[in-house]
Amino acid sequence: MESASLAGPSSQPVFLAENRNLRLFTIFLLYAGQGIPLGLFDFTIPAWMAVSGASARDIAFVVAMTGIPWSFKFIAGFMMDRYTLLAMGRRRIWIIGAQIVMIALLAIFAIISPGPRDVLILGLVALAVNTATVFQDVAVDGLTVDILPEEERSMGGALASGGQVIGIAVSAGLTGTMVYAFGASAAYIACALLVVLVTVHVIWVRERVGERRLPWSRGEAQQVNILAQADHWLPLLKGALRNTFSRQSLSYFPILVSVGLTYGICLIAVPMIATGETGWAEDQLGSLNGTAQLVAGVATIAIGG
């Protein structure tokens, strides 16, 4: 397959369904956007807590609160498939809304500025921001399925996986340095500004010709979206249960649990060992995590695309 350019087009149409390069660039950018809070809460905050002397139990609590919303993605999926503003496309209103909530929460928590020993508040911060991120993630998954033709699925999948990892890399490296030099509030603000950039792009593009850019703009729902929109909850529930408990889905369950357990343990153990045994600071851990994630992201795109 011919490799797609990741540069945002300037003179071509801003409709995702009509512009291949824009489609693929947007998929990459949106998945990178959801990696931004993950880099902060999976890597930088645990490292910051460990450097400040927090216990493994406290770090585990924050990591667990970060992961809880990701266990309930199906709820977000139900809501998006049932309710949306079709005149803006099936997914854009949810993506824009979720990212605005992410930005607002990060700004609020930058003002509140909980310390490394404020474990309950940090856990609630992680829970709130990641809940918004889950809605963004599910909406982007849906957008990817809606707009990518079959021949672009391989490249789209590589850009999705690699984009998220690169977003984590940028976030982990940047926020690790920000926390070390300026404090945690600066890291929250840095993440919020990165999400702002992604949000501006999503507001600029549209899914299909004739749709609205914003809720108050001129435009109308397209027939392909009207036909795809679910009118009742029951078919959605039946389809979700059928797919969840299919033989293929259940066969992946032990693998996913094993990967999740390993990942969670590493999120707690690595900062504890790095700070306790080697005396590393937040910026050093951020550089390590950022570099590792960047290499993984580039490799994913190169191999998968």
Regions found by a protein language model. Name each.
Residues 37, 43-58, 268-286:
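Short amphipathic helix-loop junctions that connect adjacent transmembrane helices
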Residues 97-104, 185-204:
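Symmetry-related core transmembrane helices of the 12-TM Major Facilitator Superfamily/SLC fold
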Residues 68-76, 287-305:
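Transmembrane alpha-helices of Major Facilitator/SLC transporters
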Residues 14-52, 127, 245-266:
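Pair of pore-lining "gating" transmembrane helices in MFS-fold secondary transporters
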Residues 5-21, 209-251:
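Juxtamembrane intracellular "pre-TM" segments in multi-pass secondary transporters
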Residues 95-117:
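C-terminal ends and interior cores of transmembrane alpha-helices
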Residues 88-95, 118, 177-194:
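A membrane-interface helix-boundary motif in multi-pass transporters
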Residues 69-73, 154-179:
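Glycine-rich segments within core transmembrane alpha-helices of 12-TM secondary carriers
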